[in-house]
UniProtKB/Swiss-Prot annotation:
Cofactor binding description: Binds 2 divalent ions per subunit. Binds 1 potassium ion per subunit.
Lineage start: Bacteria, Pseudomonadati, Thermodesulfobacteriota, Desulfovibrionia, Desulfovibrionales
Coiled-coil region(s): none
Name of the protein in question: S-adenosylmethionine synthase
Pathway: Amino-acid biosynthesis; S-adenosyl-L-methionine biosynthesis; S-adenosyl-L-methionine from L-methionine: step 1/1
Binding partners and assembly: Homotetramer; dimer of dimers.
GO CC, alphabetical: cytoplasm
Record has Transmembrane helix as a keyword: no
Length: 389
């Protein structure tokens, strides 16, 4: 799609940490982190459902650690900002129910091995990684700016700059491309939960000033950029009271905003033995290093696994037409530079740590901060050597 010629629009959306699906993701990853902090080899598959006044935890967890589910839920909800029963979700009074079993022994025997390096994949499936040179973090422009807007919505709410905002919110950005290159932002959509006493006009003016124009660069916004804010006119009922939230329902905004492909697997609540997560992180690491190496301007990586088998069944690297180097040569270089077996992915990216809760909001990729080891471009030189460029 991004190779299209001519002029076209591409849109991506993001949601804030108060969106019900993201509340669920944060709880699942909060539980995962609490367990990994005590037991790095734990096997965790933790799912969360949130609705009015209730959080339900389910899944399969095999560990020597203890995690206080109610405390983790309440602390997470408190951090997000649901602190009143009038919002339909209050960290002090919400009910917490759990039903958790151990991981199936049939799955465990495919993952656990006498030699750690022979660790099999925790499931079958294919994972995709993507990178492009549209932004400084090598992420597509639409999702990059959508996440920026969502983070700003939360920032002005928590800092009190716009104290009438509430935790739930969504953003969407449509970028205009010419021959595959982003040239301007055509339209912006913001939906933000708010207090009942703010008028629609005042809310729109404040969000334009403090969120949209504060965040988006003048070079991409012009007089023809269209802005849509709370277009139903009212967004008082939100969060888990407005919609039931579930872990793993925001997989596109978690990744590349629809730019490139997606294997279908969610991330939150899963330990790194689950290749849905670790394989996708590795695919991003490979793709980003390939673009950083200068070998191509865009790169997509697909890795496929079989449960209980260490070696990937297939690996494909494509420049999507952005390089003179054949895809076959790019793929060969990746196989030379990277060991894509699950044990070595976890070891190289140091994934058996409590690093996951920060990933659960505003995208798992394009975040160049401590803990996001898959965003480091330390393999670019090795790829240049392998490709002889």
């Amino acid at each position: 799609m991004i190779n299209a010629k001519g002029r076209y629009l591409f849109s991506s959306e993001s949601v804030t940490e108060g969106h019900p699906d993201k509340v669920a993701d944060q709880i699942s990853d909060g539980i995962l982190d609490a367990i990994l902090a005590q037991d790095p080899d734990a096997h965790v598959a933790c799912e969360t459902l949130v609705t009015t006044g209730l959080a339900f935890i389910a899944g399969e967890i095999t560990t020597k650690a203890y995690a206080d589910f109610p405390s983790i839920v309440r602390e997470t909800v408190k951090e997000i900002g649901y602190n009143s029963s009038t919002m339909g979700f209050d960290w002090e009074t919400c009910a917490v129910i759990s039903s958790v079993d151990k991981q199936s022994v049939d799955i465990a025997q495919g993952v656990s091995r006498t030699k750690p390096e022979d660790q099999g994949a925790g499931d079958q499936g294919m994972m995709f990684g993507f990178a492009c040179d549209e932004t400084e973090t090598l992420m597509p422009a639409p999702i990059y700016w959508a996440h920026k807007l969502s983070r700003r919505l939360t920032e002005v709410r928590k800092s009190g700059v716009l104290d009438f905002l509430r935790p739930d919110g969504k953003t969407q950005v449509a970028v205009e491309y010419v021959d595959g290159k982003p040239v301007r932002i055509d339209n912006v959509v913001v939906a933000s939960q708010h207090a009942e006493n703010i008028s629609h006009a005042d809310l729109c003016d404040a969000v334009k000033k403090e969120v949209i124009f504060h965040t988006l660069p003048e070079s991409l916004v012009d007089k023809n950029t269209k802005i849509y804010i709370n277009t139903t006119g009212r967004f008082v009922i939100g969060g888990p009271m407005g919609d039931c939230g579930l872990t793993g329902r925001k997989i596109i905004q978690d990744t590349y905003g629809g730019m490139g492909n997606h294997g279908g697997g969610a991330f939150s609540g899963k330990d790194p033995s689950k290749v849905d997560r670790s394989g996708a992180y590795m695919a991003r690491y490979v793709a980003k290093n390939m673009v950083a190496s200068g070998a191509c301007k865009r790169c997509e990586v697909q890795i496929a696994y079989c449960i209980g088998v260490a070696e990937p069944l297939s690996v494909l690297v494509t420049s999507m037409g952005s390089s003179d180097i054949p895809d076959e040569a790019l793929t060969k270089a990746v196989r030379e530079v990277f060991d894509l077996r699950p044990y070595y992915i976890s070891k190289r990216l140091d994934l058996k740590r409590p690093i996951y809760k920060p990933t659960s909001c505003y995208g798992h990729f394009g975040r160049e901060q401590a803990g996001f080891t898959w965003e480091v471009t330390d393999a670019a030189a090795d790829l240049r050597t392998a490709l002889k460029i």
